[in-house]
Every structure is written in C-alpha cells, then in structure tokens.
Amino acid sequence: MNISIINYIAVVTAVVSQLACHKSDRLVEDNVENARVQLSSLLALSEEGDTLRIPSTFKAGEVEFVPEDDWVSGFFAGTLWYMYELTADEMWADHARVHTEKLDSIQYLTWHHDVGFMVFDSFGNGLRIKNIPEYRDKILTTAHSLSTRFRTGAGVLQSWNVDRGWQAERGWKCPVIIDNMMNLEILFNATRMSGDSTFFKIAVSHADRTLENHFRPDASSYHVVDYDPETGEVLHRCTAQGYADESAWARGQAWALYGFATAYSYTGFERYLEQSEKVAAYIIGRLPEDGVPYWDFDAPDIPDTYRDASSAAIMASAFYHLYSITGTIQYRQTADKMLSSLSSPAYRAEPGTNGGFILMHSVGSLPHGSNIDVPLNYADYYFLEALIRRSKLK
C-alpha cells in the first residue's frame, strides 16, 4: 500500500477517535449539568427543616424518604460523593459528609446483609475520595457486623432473616440472593485495611457458593437460593422480585454481572471474571434495541411492560468495568448504548421535574407492588458511577 495512503488512514483514524472522545466528554458534561440542577433541588428538600432526610423515590407528586436502616439509605450520600468527584465542587463533598455521617449507627446493624450497600457507598466513597480517617473504623466495624451473618455450615452470608415480614412466609431457612454479591466489596476492603484475612475468606466462600449454585446453564441467575444453614444443602431455587422462579429478573442479572467483576478485581481469581463474562454474554444477547432491559427478561408481556432504568445503570457501570479489565470493545459499546439511552428524554428527566431525581422508569419489586415505574435513588447512583467510569477510560 502507498505510504501516503497509510498516513492518510492513520490521520483519519486519529481524528475519528478524537471526535468520539469529544462526543463522550459532551455526554458526560451534559449529564453532570443536568444532575447538578436535579440534585440541588433534591438536596435542598432533604435538608429542609430540622431533620435530615434520605430521599428514595418520587411518587404521586411527592418525594418519599426512608429511615437509616432501609437498604437504600446509603445511595443518596454516595450520589453526593459522586457529584463531588464529577465536579470538584466542595459544596457536594460538604453535603455528602453530612449525609454520610447520618448513617453512623448502621455500622452496628446485623439483621440483614445490605450494610455493604449502605456503608460502603457512603463511608466507603468518602474514605476513597476524601481520605477521612475516621471512616476507616466505620467500614471495619460494618465488616464485622456483616460477618456475623456468615453461616459456616453453608459457607454463605445469609441475606434475609426469616423470622418476620414476608420472608417468614416463604418457608426459607437460609436465603441468599444474588444481590449479596454486591456486599462483598466491603469485606475485601476490610482485609486490605486490617490485614485480617477472615473477611477475605468469608467473601470468597460466599462468591464460590454463589458461583456453584445460583446459575443456570445459560448463565442467567436465580434470584434466591435457600440453603440448609447446617449442611449447605440447596433446598430451593426461586425468586422474590422476578416474574417467576425460572425467569431472569433483570436487576438480578445486573448484580451478578457487577458483583463477579468486582470480586475478580479484588482477588484476581479467573473463575470470577469468567462468570461475569458469561453473564455479560447472556445480557447482551437479550437486550432490547435501546439497551435498557425490561424489568424481567422473561416477562410474558414484552414489549408491553416496564423497562428498568436502574438495571441499565448498574449494567452500564459494570460493562465499563469489564471493558477496563479485558479491553473487549463489545462491553464498552454496550455500556455506551445504555448511557446514551439513559441520557435521552425517554429516561432522563427534564430539569425541575421528577422530584429532583435524574432518571425515570425504574422498577423496585413488581411482585410486591413496590416502586413500579418510578425514579429510584440507586438508579441515579449507578448512573453517575457509570459516567465516572466512562470519563476515566482512555
């Protein structure tokens, strides 16, 4: 080939790549500006009056708030930390710290597994971003609290207690949900901070048992696996928030994708990366055209059913992470498509609407009639995380 033609192709390729980067930057910048407007409004409402409140969703024209011990309580503080990371505006860090420290008592909570979400997304981000020394002890105490839920005979962290609420009606003994993969990160970090390998060993045991028992041959994940806590025997495989026991609940697949990629990052164990990539292939093969999944991949009324923006946001963040690990371009392309769709008027709220939340059209738990087709604080959290991960890619 003529040298001049080769040089021409190289120049064109470089220009196209540069334009793509500029387009990427514009998408991030546009979303940050939108988030600034929305979250400023939501922040003001959360701090109105004498009581600091934790916004979770917006329904029937009203923002709804949750108590500190709700599983979603850490996401708003984490969202504020992400806004600081995206803007370098100290105002966001100041408010993030206030909302984080409201959750101080959660480090002692032992009656469910979601303390990883609650504390690591708040105190964990604060420690990572601002290196606030006292946050280290909060994380270690939380890791100890979470570790009390480890059932040695089964080798897993029990997700829910079964002595109260709707969980008591299911006949479970030691239910483990795929979501629990997301709570292992705080254990991995606790070992790094303390040198105590107990946390690491618990996290690996749980991940290995999940790898062994949660997945179907097509790499889709069950939502719930119930164990005998003494023997480790699998008693049931079923769902709580999906369409059916054998269906693929979208957010469950998102947790699996994200959780195993994260476990690989902390351990270097190839089996975790392989599982995350198997889940990735399953998801990519079943996504609708715009990349935003329906609430369950097997919902019987597709396409006339709800999308779940929260699942797309979690998946987008996880796909960027997988791309940074493997360099597989399909992962970046999938994440880019998801972010592009979530940034469109179909899913991103206009400034001044949606109660101050960024994204519309998420689904909490359709079987429970809870938070259907509404904004959710964790959708916004993972959306901003995906923007951060995208902005850091070369």
Per-segment meaning from a language model:
Residues M1-R26:
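Bacterial Sec-dependent N-terminal signal peptides
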Residues S24-K394:
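Glycan-recognition and catalytic cores of secretory/periplasmic carbohydrate-active enzymes
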